């Protein structure tokens, strides 16, 4: 359903799929079946604006550009960094972009495995992730890649939303957040709501590798007409 009803229209028509029947599914907290952690977050308030807050139609006043790197403390002149601040046009990274990203930053980047053994528990796994991230930042790392790609029958994933939120809060508590970017490489993110939730809770960029792999499989079946794969991803 995610591929056919959500991702396919976004790649083919460059817009989110719309529906008119409303959402009558139970709230995630009341559901008897598994629901992703993203479903537990709901928007409490919406503001209608005219003109719309839209990075495409109103690009003079609205942008999705994302800064990353060692931002330092902009209020402390003694702490201003001389390092370059890099900018992306979007916080969503394709699979090829994340590979270039990793190669570009080299030793200034660390990849943190956000999976854990069945012999561990979730709390211990999160504490381990927080400790690794703090040590890395104190040693001068400017890019954290949080990944759940090592998921297997023997290794369970820490929900990426928990991983990002825990590290973001932990680094803020220790006054280290401004020195590093948090980049989420996750197979959980399948729609704009999950992207927005990750970014809202502290991620700098998101690489939805599983969603992109799914779209590539549909592209190989020639389900996107005359569009090439890169064009579908950009759309």
Which role fits each region the language model picked out?
Residues 80, 85-86, 129, 146-148, ...:
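A broad, low-amplitude sensor of folded, mature protein cores
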Residues 1-129, 134, 138:
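Extended, highly charged accessory segments
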């Amino acid at each position: 359903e995610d591929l056919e009803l959500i991702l396919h229209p976004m790649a083919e028509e460059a817009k989110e799929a719309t529906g008119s029947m409303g959402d009558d599914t139970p709230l995630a907290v009341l559901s008897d079946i598994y629901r992703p952690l993203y479903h537990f977050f709901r928007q409490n308030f919406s503001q209608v604006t005219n003109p719309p807050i839209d990075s495409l139609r109103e690009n003079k006043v609205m942008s999705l550009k994302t800064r990353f790197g060692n931002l330092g403390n902009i209020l402390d002149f003694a702490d201003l960094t001389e390092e370059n601040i890099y900018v992306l046009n979007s916080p969503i990274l394709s699979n090829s972009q994340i590979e270039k990203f990793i190669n570009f930053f080299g030793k200034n980047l660390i990849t943190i495995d956000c999976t854990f053994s069945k012999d561990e528990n979730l709390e211990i796994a999160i504490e381990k992730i927080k400790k690794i991230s703090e040590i890395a930042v104190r040693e001068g790392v400017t890019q954290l890649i949080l990944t759940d790609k090592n998921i297997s029958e023997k290794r369970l994933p820490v929900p990426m939303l928990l991983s990002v939120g825990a590290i973001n809060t932990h680094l803020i508590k220790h006054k280290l957040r401004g020195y590093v970017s948090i980049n989420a490489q996750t197979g959980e993110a399948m729609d704009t709501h999950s992207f927005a939730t990750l970014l809202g809770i502290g991620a700098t960029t998101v690489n939805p590798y599983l969603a992109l792999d799914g779209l590539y499989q549909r592209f190989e079946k020639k389900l996107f007409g005359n569009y090439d794969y890169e064009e579908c991803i950009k759309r």
